[in-house]
């Protein structure tokens, strides 16, 4: 009982597996044969491609013909009768030629259907077949239509020229157009084309280019002077009368004693903070019309005004001032009312004290 069961299971499993393995081996052998054929075809194609006479063009279909086609054409030429033969013999040749051409096309079609052929190889084969058919038809027409030997060469030449139209490359296909850069010369009147006019045109063009370049540079300078390059607070448009030492708000935002020594009567500093600007304007608050008043009264009034103002004005102290060289700088030299952290800290501490 157990033996019969094991035999049944072995047959049920082993027979299908064995048949499948045999079929797979057969397919594998067929595939290997196909790969070998394709490799051989590819080698032939590479040989034809790298051959100088094998390039595909409309003028050299002759080198692309196969040896079998050439042998068939040679045999057909040997079988052709003389041109002096009757019209009955010549009329029978087109049908025979058509039959032969069909017979030649059939094996090619069978070969394409039986074996795998790439698309570019199919195109080359079709071009070869068309060229062969066209040559056979041209020969048949020349044999049938020509009545005599004298007219045969002329008519065959004219028919071949009629059917085969080659495109001739002209000089204009290889010409590179070049246009001169000077506009007035290109559209100038030929009658007025003299040396003097050319010199005048050159001088006028040079002068025009120089003027345009100079005007563009001036406009650029004006735009750069009026632009605000990242200052902390909006400022007025800059003017050309400002001092050269004050270049930008990001570099000078303090009222230093070094710059204020030689600038008593200078214009308003647009880069200074409001508090420092008020301090710099203190010496200019005196009216010049009242210089005739007593010197003692004016000195006393100015001293009292300065002492009153100094209580409310916050002064930036740093090592860059002449007056406080020995002191240690406690504030940043680029501080203003927006970035004065020390003053804000002091105000905050004072606000915390009980009142």
UniProtKB/Swiss-Prot annotation:
<feature type="transmembrane region" description="Helical; Signal-anchor for type III membrane protein">
    <location>
        <begin position="9"/>
        <end position="29"/>
    </location>
</feature>
<keyword id="KW-0961">Cell wall biogenesis/degradation</keyword>
<protein>
    <recommendedName>
        <fullName>Suppressor of lethality of KEX2 GAS1 double null mutant protein 1</fullName>
    </recommendedName>
</protein>
<keyword id="KW-0812">Transmembrane</keyword>
<comment type="function">
    <text>Plays a role in cell wall integrity. Affects the cell wall polymer composition in the growing region of the cell.</text>
</comment>
<dbReference type="GO" id="GO:0033101">
    <property type="term" value="C:cellular bud membrane"/>
</dbReference>
<feature type="region of interest" description="Disordered">
    <location>
        <begin position="70"/>
        <end position="114"/>
    </location>
</feature>
<keyword id="KW-0472">Membrane</keyword>
<feature type="compositionally biased region" description="Basic and acidic residues">
    <location>
        <begin position="92"/>
        <end position="108"/>
    </location>
</feature>
<comment type="similarity">
    <text>Belongs to the SKG1 family.</text>
</comment>
<keyword id="KW-0597">Phosphoprotein</keyword>
<keyword id="KW-1133">Transmembrane helix</keyword>
<feature type="topological domain" description="Cytoplasmic">
    <location>
        <begin position="30"/>
        <end position="355"/>
    </location>
</feature>
<keyword id="KW-0735">Signal-anchor</keyword>
<dbReference type="GO" id="GO:0071555">
    <property type="term" value="P:cell wall organization"/>
</dbReference>
<feature type="modified residue" description="Phosphoserine">
    <location>
        <position position="142"/>
    </location>
</feature>
<feature type="topological domain" description="Extracellular">
    <location>
        <begin position="1"/>
        <end position="8"/>
    </location>
</feature>
<feature type="modified residue" description="Phosphothreonine">
    <location>
        <position position="273"/>
    </location>
</feature>
<keyword id="KW-1003">Cell membrane</keyword>
